[in-house]
A protein has these predicted regions:
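Charged, glycine-rich active-site and insertion segments that engage polyanionic ligands
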Residues: 1-39, 43-56, 115-116, 124-276
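Helical "lid/switch" subdomain of P-loop NTPase nucleotide-binding domains
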Residues: 90, 94, 102, 125-129, ...
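Structural motif
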Residues: 32, 89-91, 120
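Conserved catalytic/switch belt of AAA+ P-loop NTPases
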Residues: 104-121
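AAA+/P-loop NTPase substrate/partner-engagement loops
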Residues: 53-71, 129
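Conserved alpha-helical scaffold flanking the Walker A/P-loop in AAA+ ATPase domains
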Residues: 19-23, 69-89, 96-97, 101-109
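Glycine-/small-residue-rich active-site loops that bind phosphorylated ligands and cofactors
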Residues: 40, 64-65, 98, 219
Length: 276
């Protein structure tokens, strides 16, 4: 039975809409939704969860915490043992923030699922989930939106032409990030400052000026990842418009730094590896 109340459609690339509707018609027992930062993975999960009347349980890190704990997963599993009159959908977001022990605790529920119970795991990187988890889930990978879609998101804004160009470059294909930058002047200003640092690193690699940009990122992993994201965007643009043999080694160093940061590596060493 469809939900009688309006359900918001997530902002998706055109190519992702048909797969989402197909999943909504026949929701799998366990689904991983992979969406890089700025894509609407959360919106896709919520759409699937509430399109049909359901009891929805949401699992996320507790306030001021960065991980989903084993105890949270066990509490959720205990709740699933109670009687349900409608289907149950458990949204775990971000799923990659489950500790390894928490993932192992979840595994039994995936191996022996309750009737009419569905798990939606939202993650930026499915490789951070245990292989045993991944093997028991279908996967929906979201893609970046088109330039035309991105431009439409900014049509109703009062941004200057320069701000529009900057946002469309820095957040290309990532609709949630586009909206955040368009609606939050402070955030846009922060991104502009990070972009200036990224430009300095790329134009004067190994210089004192490039090294001087880094200390403000050493104690802020999230900000360091933003810097890396912008560096990747800029290098990809350079490779497309002004190809050079120097680009690939630089791209490899940036990707290595990103991987280290996402696996809780030392921020200082990861960033210095790009510049030095």
């Amino acid at each position: 039975m469809p939900n009688p109340h309006p359900v918001n459609m997530p902002i998706l690339a055109h190519r992702d809409r048909t797969p989402l509707h197909q999943l909504a018609d026949r929701l799998p027992q366990a689904l991983i939704i992979t969406a890089e930062r700025g894509l609407d993975g959360t919106g896709a999960a919520e759409y699937l969860a509430i399109l049909t009347p359901s009891e929805v349980l949401r699992l996320q890190p507790l306030e001021a915490k960065t991980t989903i704990t084993t105890e949270q997963v066990r509490t959720m599993i205990a709740m699933l043992r109670t009687h349900a009159t409608v289907r149950r959908v458990i949204v775990i977001n971000p799923a990659d923030q489950m500790s390894e022990a928490a993932q192992n605790a979840l595994l039994k529920s995936l191996e022996e699922p309750n009737v009419n119970t569905h798990f939606l795991l939202v993650t930026e990187n499915e490789q951070q989930l245990l292989a045993t988890i991944r093997s028991r889930c279908q996967v929906l990978t979201l893609h970046r939106t088109s330039q035309a879609q991105d431009e439409t998101l900014l049509d109703a804004t009062s941004l200057t032409a320069s701000e529009r160009r900057q946002i469309l470059f820095l957040a290309a294909g990532r609709p949630l990030l586009i909206r955040q930058l368009a609606r939050t002047p402070k955030l846009l200003s922060e991104y502009q400052a990070i972009a200036a640092d990224a430009k300095c690193i790329l134009t004067t690699p190994g210089s004192y000026e490039a090294l001087r940009t880094l200390p403000s990122y050493f104690t802020d992993r999230a900000k360091a990842l933003q810097l890396i994201d912008i560096l990747l965007t800029m290098v990809a643009f350079q490779m497309k418009t002004q190809p050079s043999p120097a680009h690939q080694p630089l791209l490899d160093r940036i990707i290595t730094a990103e991987t280290r940061l996402r696996h809780n590596g030392n921020v200082r060493l990861a960033l210095l590896n790009i510049v030095v």
